[in-house]
Amino acid sequence: MTTEIHSNPANRPNRIASVERNTAETQVSVTVNLDGTGQGKIDTGVPFLDHMLDQIKRHGLFDLDITCKGDTYIDDHHSIEDTGITLGQAFAKALGDKKGIRRYGHFYAPLDESLTRAVVDISGRPGLHMDIPFTRSHVGNFDVDLFSEFFFGFVNHAWMTVHLDNLKGKNSHHQIECTFKAFARALRMACEYDERALNTLPSTKEAL
């Protein structure tokens, strides 16, 4: 016997949220539908980040519309971090009271020689635990140090615990991309509804 997992039971509205973040450094707008089909448009002004957010959209089956106008003439740091922050806020808002969700998700994703494990807990306790031994400092113009800035921004504002471990990898592009794919699948699993527990919180504390 298996547990039935559904993105959204027929009697519940889609979980949709929109958030804007405007600072002297960036103007970010995010709309997310947790119960989508992987549709939407992404334009952050950082092409490599757009490519990675497409992985979240496609493999998580989240509808995502994201725009960011930032001070990329300085560097990409503010745009990447603030996109992570705003996306995290949108997920937290869309999840609502969290009743009925699976809460936990995990996935292994390969990309050629690279393999990453992602584990997500929609715990209400933000924390990023990451071990990605990059083999170079840049992928094209993308500084790999900014990879963690996106995820720190996301988890701190989505109120999730996330573990990301690249178990094998030599190509930094592959390491990053398979990490985003694994994260997308794990996040999808954690956000989905558990048919057997639709009206309860997945916590013995009765709080998340």
Curated annotation (Swiss-Prot):
GO molecular function: imidazoleglycerol-phosphate dehydratase activity
Swiss-Prot/TrEMBL catalytic activity: D-erythro-1-(imidazol-4-yl)glycerol 3-phosphate = 3-(imidazol-4-yl)-2-oxopropyl phosphate + H2O
Any one of the GO CC terms: cytoplasm
Entries under SUPFAM superfamilies matching the protein: Ribosomal protein S5 domain 2-like
Domain of life of the native organism: Bacteria
Family under the similarity heading: Belongs to the imidazoleglycerol-phosphate dehydratase family.
Record gene name: hisB
GO terms (BP aspect): L-histidine biosynthetic process
UniProt pathway annotation: Amino-acid biosynthesis; L-histidine biosynthesis; L-histidine from 5-phospho-alpha-D-ribose 1-diphosphate: step 6/9
Protein name: Imidazoleglycerol-phosphate dehydratase
InterPro entries with a match to the protein in the record: IGPD_sf (IPR038494), ImidazoleglycerolP_deHydtase (IPR000807), ImidazoleglycerP_deHydtase_CS (IPR020565), Ribosomal_Su5_D2-typ_SF (IPR020568)
Lineage per the UniProt record: Bacteria, Pseudomonadati, Pseudomonadota, Gammaproteobacteria, Moraxellales
Amino-acid biosynthesis as UniProt keyword: yes
Pfam families: IGPD (PF00475)
